[in-house]
Amino acid sequence: MKKQLKYCFFSLFVSLSSILSSCGSTTFVLANFESYISPLLLERVQEKHPLTFLTYPSNEKLINGFANNTYSVAVASTYAVSELIERDLLSPIDWSQFNLKKSSSSSDKVNNASDAKDLFIDSIKEISQQTKDSKNNELLHWAVPYFLQNLVFVYRGEKISELEQENVSWTDVIKAIVKHKDRFNDNRLVFIDDARTIFSLANIVNTNNNSADVNPKEDGIGYFTNVYESFQRLGLTKSNLDSIFVNSDSNIVINELASGRRQGGIVYNGDAVYAALGGDLRDELSEEQIPDGNNFHIVQPKISPVALDLLVINKQQSNFQKEAHEIIFDLALDGADQTKEQLIKTDEELGTDDEDFYLKGAMQNFSYVNYVSPLKVISDPSTGIVSSKKNNAEMKSKQMSTDQMTSEKEFDYYTETLKALLEKEDSAELNENEKKLVETIKKAYTIEKDSSIRWNQLVEKPISPLQRSNLSLSWLDFKLHWW
């Protein structure tokens, strides 16, 4: 899901148990999935606020961390937010504390969750609507959107014609993998080892997009087994493809796809983008391995699981409410009501060697994480920074000195590709294959769906303890027998 950290946050290491024993209502703890935040931004936040930063591997660990009062602020997926709401563990978001306007051209203040919708892309507005039986049916009342993502299929090498058609489904993808199995044999196909994510995908495949709901309808183990076996019924088995590489560490998955050691994989779109940029191995790849527009392809099926992660505040830590809102602003909302010109400003006076050192926290985080920002100013398909319809080169050049522009001529594939992605200066240095890749990346940042499907059908909701147990058992059994 995330990239390896490039910077060290702590000068010494302590055991997790000793960290936890020192945490609680007297210590502000910011918690997140590993490598799901810009290290430079985290350093800035730590300079302003004394806090402990911890990571967790799953939403279930996050929920436990809130229940035992360890975490003050954390990132949670939608279904985890729903569960935390039901367990009365969240403090409502006071949107007035952020001192935001509804847009850069508006003087109207954002005072509540309803006002806040104006800051976000359209998909967020629908996803934020919770089920009718929840305590409050507006997700934005309890949480601040952090990043949005959906599942895509990545493959290396020549294009597969069946996957270049419009309205490709996940069933089409699985059939294409099986048809072209010689490309993916010998452990060259990779899946994320996450029971819930793969179930969501399998459920869409199982219904052949007819119901297109990623959430389970039953709780028996036979039901979950049958859904997982939808892959087997289409021929996606280790007996047919020799073996399938399944790994829970998305960093490994990203780098395997970036290097070409794996020829295909099902990953989140942000991870696909980072792999397209070379992943953590970009400085080590040979010319033949480096992804470009001819050998790296991202397929976005028309109906695909969607994940929205949000920042939440622990209700039990009432003494940290002011700090919690300030930190959430720094991580996710700083720049949300600004113009694009303001959003892409950098601070050269700080003397950093990192070219992606943005003044606004939301832009700094986006430039590192590479997932879809929920903010309209960044991700709106017509007016956002990541848009093929606008050119930001002129606004960027106005902010740069002659010396800076000269120094940026020094070519680096990774930064040049990111510049082209954001339509900054010097994108002409990219060759045609690299420009094709940039267009592929831009498309990956646009998450769309079939008009007949509601966003909430594609977002995971809470499941019962029995469903969770049977889902996990069925997944383990399926992997053992078929993958």
From Swiss-Prot:
Its main location: membrane. A lipid is attached at C23 (S-diacylglycerol cysteine). A lipid is attached at C23 (N-palmitoyl cysteine). One of its GO terms (cellular component) is plasma membrane. It is found in: Cell membrane. Keywords: Cell membrane, Lipoprotein, Membrane, Palmitate, Signal. Residues 1-22 form the signal peptide. It is a lipid-anchor. InterPro entries: Uncharacterised_lipoprot_MG045. SUPFAM superfamilies: Periplasmic binding protein-like II. This is Uncharacterized lipoprotein MG045.
